[in-house]
């Protein structure tokens, strides 16, 4: 199996959000891949939608119903436990991708030998394949064989998790994987990585998305994600070497983003 795509799902049935995501995945131009959708105890009919796709695409589509709500990190971990692919990709269940999204990233990986490949993305407020506001997820100078300077740059601005594919060992050899029961788990997580400077991922902005729904719990989770980042820097013995960058990233995540969330 070349690729496993993991989709954490929680209450995305309304307005065809989940359908748009899944349709974009089952229509990918790569052939050797699987889709692992993890329902995180949805209270709408998201699980029923997932079961329909599993029925219609039995050789490609697998549904896991989580016994408890573990947030996106826990759902990702459940999916990873079932993943067979040499490469791992993640997608938010309210977003969608171009039909050749994974083909182009895998092609880039084969040509360069990179452990991780990413791309740019669109910001959009409606379901469409039209070009929206293009966001450059990372800088070209951050790519290639990762030096200390590139690591410093990536700590300060690592970009989004979901617009990348990862060599299996990068994720599965990571002892803590994703923290569970909190939002913003992306902040808690190669030797080389490459960037395809083309927007292939559609990031859907709406009122119920994780980063646009502000609650006390989510602000507390953001702060906990910052603490996790520091704990893991200590665990892997790179806190001292990259202290200024980690301190800056912690301050942004723990204080600045949380403050602006409360003010929004």
Where are each of the predicted segments found?
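Short, well-formed alpha-helical segments that are part of the catalytic scaffolds
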Residues: 12-27
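Short aromatic/hydrophobic "clamp" motif used to bind/position activated sugar donors
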Residues: 88
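Conserved nucleotide-sugar donor-binding catalytic segment
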Residues: 148-216, 221
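Glycine-rich, basic loop-to-helix element that forms the pyrophosphate-binding segment
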Residues: 66-83
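A conserved acidic beta->alpha catalytic loop
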Residues: 31, 39-48, 68
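Conserved donor NDP-sugar-binding/catalytic core segment of glycosyltransferases
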Residues: 100-133
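Cell-envelope/extracellular polymer assembly enzymes that use nucleotide-activated donors
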Residues: 2-6, 34, 188
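C-terminal subregions of glycosyltransferases and related glycan-biosynthesis enzymes
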Residues: 204-264
């Amino acid at each position: 199996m070349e690729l496993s795509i993991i989709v954490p799902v929680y209450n995305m049935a309304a307005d065809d959000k989940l359908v748009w995501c899944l349709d974009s995945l089952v229509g990918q131009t790569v052939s050797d891949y699987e889709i692992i959708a993890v329902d995180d105890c949805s209270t709408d009919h998201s699980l029923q939608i997932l079961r329909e796709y599993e029925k219609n695409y039995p050789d490609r589509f697998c549904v896991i119903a989580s016994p408890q709500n573990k947030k996106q990190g826990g759902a990702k971990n459940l999916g990873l436990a079932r993943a067979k692919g040499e490469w791992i990709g993640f997608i938010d269940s309210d977003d969608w991708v171009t039909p050749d999204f994974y083909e182009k990233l895998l092609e880039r990986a084969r040509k360069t030998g990179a452990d991780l490949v990413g791309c740019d993305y669109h910001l959009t407020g409606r379901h469409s394949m039209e070009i929206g506001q293009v966001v450059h997820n990372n800088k070209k100078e951050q790519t290639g064989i990762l030096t200390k300077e590139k690591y410093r740059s990536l700590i300060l601005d690592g970009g989004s998790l979901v617009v990348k594919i990862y060599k299996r060992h990068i994720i599965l050899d990571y002892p803590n994987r994703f923290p569970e029961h909190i939002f913003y788990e992306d902040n808690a997580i190669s030797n080389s990585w490459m960037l395809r400077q083309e927007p292939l991922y559609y990031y859907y902005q709406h009122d119920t998305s994780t980063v646009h729904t502000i609650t006390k719990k989510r602000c507390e989770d953001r702060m906990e994600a910052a603490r996790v980042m520091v704990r893991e820097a200590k665990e892997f013995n790179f806190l001292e070497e990259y202290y200024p960058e980690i301190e800056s990233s912690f301050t942004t995540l723990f204080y600045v983003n949380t403050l602006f969330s409360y003010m929004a």
